[in-house]
């Protein structure tokens, strides 16, 4: 599932998965390529070229309460090969319902498409992306009133860009 968000001019991947038997055969890469193609087409309908794609990922270094269906270090290697890096920001997903808690231990990852964004993403774009994602995908009407969003917004507002660390480097496998 991919959403195109016009304000940050970005695609957000909510889900991209393959059954275990199909892994290692290029299915995930093909799904990502099609999602990227669709996001680019959506951006062009607004008169712009797509600037980036973002997603959430379990932080491989943080133990989760629910077992992951894939080794998180393997997942990080795969997404690295697909061109994604970890955004160096304090991202916490707000609770999905009143009965749940906010989800810590996640990385916000990004694949820059815009020239000049290989090492960092403009802070305003990160802020806009998360606000629009919360509004449209999570149905949080006023992201500014959400404590998890406010913490991220306050953090990004103090800098011009958010550093983008290649996922292989993040997991310690590359200089």
Question: Each PLM stretch: what is its role?
Answer:
Residues 18, 24-41:
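Conserved acetyl-CoA-binding loop-helix of GNAT-fold acetyltransferases
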Residues 20-23, 60-62:
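A short acidic, glycine/proline-enriched capping/turn motif at secondary-structure boundaries
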Residues 44-175:
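Terminal substrate-recognition subdomain of acyl/acetyltransferases
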Residues 11, 25-28, 39, 65-67, ...:
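Generic alpha-helix signal with a bias toward terminal, lower-confidence helices
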Residues 14, 36, 56:
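Acidic-residue sensor for enzyme active/binding pockets
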Residues 8-11, 26, 30, 34, ...:
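Short, well-structured alpha-helical interface segments that form or flank functional binding sites
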Residues 1-22:
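A conserved beta-strand-loop-helix scaffold within acyl/acetyltransferase catalytic domains
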């Amino acid at each position: 599932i991919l959403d195109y968000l016009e304000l940050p001019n970005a695609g957000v991947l909510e889900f991209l998965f393959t059954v275990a038997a199909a892994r290692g055969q290029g299915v995930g890469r093909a799904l990502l390529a099609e999602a990227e193609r669709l996001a680019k087409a959506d951006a062009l309908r607004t008169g712009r070229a797509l600037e980036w794609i973002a997603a959430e990922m379990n932080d491989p270094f943080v133990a989760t309460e629910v077992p992951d269906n894939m080794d998180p270090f393997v997942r990080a290697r795969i997404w690295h090969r697909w061109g994604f890096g970890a955004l160096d920001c304090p991202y916490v997903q707000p609770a999905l319902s009143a009965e749940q808690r906010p989800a810590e231990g996640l990385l916000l990852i990004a694949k820059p498409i815009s020239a000049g964004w290989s090492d960092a993403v403009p802070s305003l774009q990160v802020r806009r992306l998360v606000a629009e994602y919360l509004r449209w995908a999570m149905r949080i009407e006023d992201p500014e009133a959400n404590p998890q969003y406010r913490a991220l917004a306050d953090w990004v507002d103090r800098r011009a860009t958010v550093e983008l660390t290649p996922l292989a480097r993040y997991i310690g496998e590359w200089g």
